[in-house]
Regions:
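His/Asp/Glu-enriched, well-ordered alpha-helical/loop segment
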Residues: 48, 69-70, 75-76, 81-157
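C-terminal cap of metal-dependent C-N hydrolases
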Residues: 91-94, 148-195
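Histidine/acidic residue-rich metal-binding segments in metalloenzymes
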Residues: 1-76
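Short, glycine-/Ser/Thr-/acidic-enriched flexible segments
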Residues: 9, 33, 81-83, 158-159, ...
Length: 196
């Protein structure tokens, strides 16, 4: 199996699309920040929007969405990359690349893909849970009697503004931005480990 990670350019989406016609062992992954933001976010958020691969154009963002729609991109991953405040306070050329993404990922997918009609909620969840679990042969990504009780309870209509993250790091362009869709509970192995 080959996984092309962090797809960010229209050309990459097309290359993967062509490769998948020749092999069923090719998978591609995109991040929520690459299907929600463009390079303009760097002007607004500075180092908080510096990542690798970098944010690109609106045409690239739309190509990623089309790739998710047609199955060219079959995985969504957060690319959660925490950095200390002092690291992200450096000038843009010196600051490390990467943002945190775990706590905003489901809300961003909900808002940018489901609410806009680009994907159904089931398609979003398939890319975020079912497909990764199958690819990496994990006993996860499904609900069944006697199966692992690992899940979140999510309110897709609830609006919230992340003022602070539970992650030790706060490097996110979504800090202080209103998002739609809130995780209310996280359950791991049948135990509530997070409650909003």
């Amino acid at each position: 199996e080959i996984v092309i990670q962090h797809i960010s350019a229209a050309e990459a989406v097309e290359l993967v699309r062509q490769a998948k016609k020749k092999s069923t062992k090719i998978h591609a992954e995109a991040t929520p920040h690459h299907f929600t933001l463009t390079e303009d976010a760097v002007m607004e958020h500075g180092t908080m929007a510096k990542m690798n691969p970098p944010l690109r154009t609106e045409a690239d963002r739309q190509a990623i969405i089309r790739g998710l729609q047609d199955g060219t991109i079959d995985l969504i991953a957060t690319d959660h990359a925490p950095h200390a405040d002092y690291e992200k306070a450096k000038p843009l050329t010196e600051a490390p690349s990467g943002i945190i993404g775990l706590e905003t990922s489901l809300a961003l997918g909900n808002e940018a893909l489901v609410d806009t009609g680009e994907l159904t909620m089931m398609q979003l969840l398939t890319c975020m849970t079912i497909n990764p679990a199958k690819l990496y042969r994990l006993d996860a990504g499904y609900l069944a009697e006697n199966g692992p009780a690992d899940l979140v309870l999510f309110d897709p209509a609830k609006e919230w503004v992340p003022e602070r993250f539970y992650s030790k790091s706060q490097n996110s362009p979504f800090l202080g931005q209103k998002l739609k869709g809130k995780v209310e509970y996280t359950i791991c192995k049948g135990k509530v480990i997070f409650e909003a």
